[in-house]
Amino acid sequence: SNYIGAHGQYTAIVKHVELKMNNDMLKDVEIVDTPGLNDPIISRGEITKKFLRECDVAFLLSYTGQFLTQEDINFMCHTLPSEGIRNIFIVGSKFDSGILDDNKSKTIEEAERKSINIYNNQAKNNIDACIREAINSEVLVRIKESLPPSYVSSILYSCSQKRKNNQSYNAAEANVVKNLMRFQGFQDD
């Protein structure tokens, strides 16, 4: 956070950060994690917009707690270029939070299914509403074609890796696992 955080000591002078992996599956693949388009450092947001015109694929991450709101979609329509990007993937992040918002389901499978249905419908309805308003419809159509979204939970992924390596959870991970235990069928193994 000293290098890329909004209040980092070196944030203002960092142009980019490169990480390399020795993995044959990633040969000739370049993955770029750009700052968000609403980055607090305005120049980085502008660099992101320029860079998107050169990308083949864009992964649009949206926190499931406020998943793909009309404001998010309008923002994407005004900032995503209509040229360059050939494929768009929508990813709902922190999916564990979405599941935990379900106060009625008894089983983890039911909570997962209901959460996915809620977020899929929300994404479709909000995109359709923006299409009706005719905001950058070319980009909207490409976003709609990418439905349904995929959902991820980095905290549960971290838990699974720690469980596999016999490591302890940190406080946040332990709390999520504890809260998910209320669902029948959820197993911490």
Task: Tell what function each PLM region has.
Residues 1-189:
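Globular "head" domains of long coiled-coil molecular machines
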